[in-house]
Amino acid sequence: MENAHAFPPALCKRLVGAGAIAVLVIDNVDHAVRVAEALWKGGVEIAEVTMRTPSAAESLALICKELPEMLPVAGTVLTPAQVDDAIDSGAAMAVAPGLQQETLRHAQQRGLPFAPGVLTPTEIEKAITLGCQTLKFFPAATGGGLPFLKSVAAPYQHLDLKFLPTGSISEDAMENYLAFPATMAVGGSWIAPRALIQGEDWEEITRRAQRARKIVDAIRREG
């Protein structure tokens, strides 16, 4: 395995400590800072802004500017152009639902930590050959859940792969994913779903963030 493209130790430590990644779909740029503030108030330190809407790049840039203490992640990064957008917006890292070699290589060349999406052993091995050690496990819940992740991760334990399980993971399931040693952090849209953002229900988002933080803290104390 190539090690040149491994995530920096400081970033890995931040991901593990934070534990929860709020996966966001932001339609209105005016909501960007408000939702980030609500998450931070509740104890969630990582905001993944999915690059699915016209306002995504600007929203990510605003979060980076107004809440520099947060860890900004660009999500659903599918093309080299979106890699450039993520970097220009200030993203600390990027993730994707799948693995596009051209996009991954561009991120590596530009120095942006990038976790491609994988589900099967074949996809994991392709990511390994391309120098990846931190992988997004997607779609986690519908793709077999934690039992499947444990099974596909087992043959690669000696490579110290780390996973970011994401995709329909419920609040109740989050604890078990975090307890798995190969899990670095868990992504969840339940913390700040699109409907709550559109409805500007910042208090409810903060309450959900607090619950996520409580789950992370409980697991980290046990570990």
Which sequence ranges carry the predicted segments?
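Conserved N-terminal beta1-alpha1 strand-loop-helix module at the mouth
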Residues: 1-90, 109, 179, 199-222
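Catalytic beta/alpha-barrel core
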Residues: 23-25, 45-53, 70-78, 83, ...
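Catalytic cores of alpha/beta
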Residues: 35, 79-89, 122-130, 153, ...
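Active-site phosphate/pyrophosphate- and oxyanion-stabilizing loops and adjacent acidic/basic residues
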Residues: 61, 150-153, 175, 210
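Glycine-rich beta-strand-to-loop/alpha-helix junction loops that act as flexible
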Residues: 74-75, 164-169, 186-189
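Glycine-rich phosphate-binding active-site loops on the catalytic face of alpha/beta enzymes
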Residues: 93-106, 136-146, 181-204
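A contiguous pocket-lining binding segment that forms or flanks enzyme active sites
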Residues: 127, 131-138, 147-149, 155-161
